[in-house]
Amino acid sequence: DGCDVGVSVTKAETIWAKYPEGQRRPHRFRDGMWSNCNLFALKSRETLGAAKAFEGGGQFGKSKKRVLQAFGWFNLLLYVSKMMTLKGTFERISKRFGVRIAPIEMPFAEAPIDVDNERTARIAREILAARAAEAA
């Protein structure tokens, strides 16, 4: 849609329908719950500044200071209060970073499953085993 940065997201319902334990903390918006897939598309070098704010991967969200620096108090308040839609949130973030950032919906339940603990490692092993069985 003419964006400069694409951020892949999957609906929480999509994940939970296939993997009930697959994602425990989706982002909650006024129009639904979404999980980040940690897959980004950057149109040009000029968009790298927006991506720099998220260096460090999944640990970004665990640092309140980094989240506040990246998004600002008001955007954080809107997010926490669930007053914004997914699209509206990305529009506000776009203004904050000075580039057009848009969500890209991924239809794959597996896309946002990070392997960063025993529970998600088990889910990943189950996914791989099921795919191997299908291929055999």
Regions found by a protein language model. Give the residues of each.
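Short amphipathic alpha-helices within nucleic acid-binding modules
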Residues: 121-126
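Short, charged/polar low-complexity linear motifs in solvent-exposed/disordered segments
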Residues: 67-68, 120, 131
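Conserved core of the sugar-phosphate nucleotidyltransferase
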Residues: 1-92, 106-109
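Short, conserved phosphate/pyrophosphate- and ester-handling motifs at nucleotide-, phospho-/glycolipid
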Residues: 117
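Short basic/hydrophobic patches in alpha-helices and adjacent helix-turn junctions
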Residues: 92-102
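…; additionally, a secondary subgroup of soluble metalloenzymes is captured
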Residues: 33, 84, 97, 127-136
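Conserved active-site beta-strand element of glycosyltransferases/polysaccharide synthases
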Residues: 102-105, 114
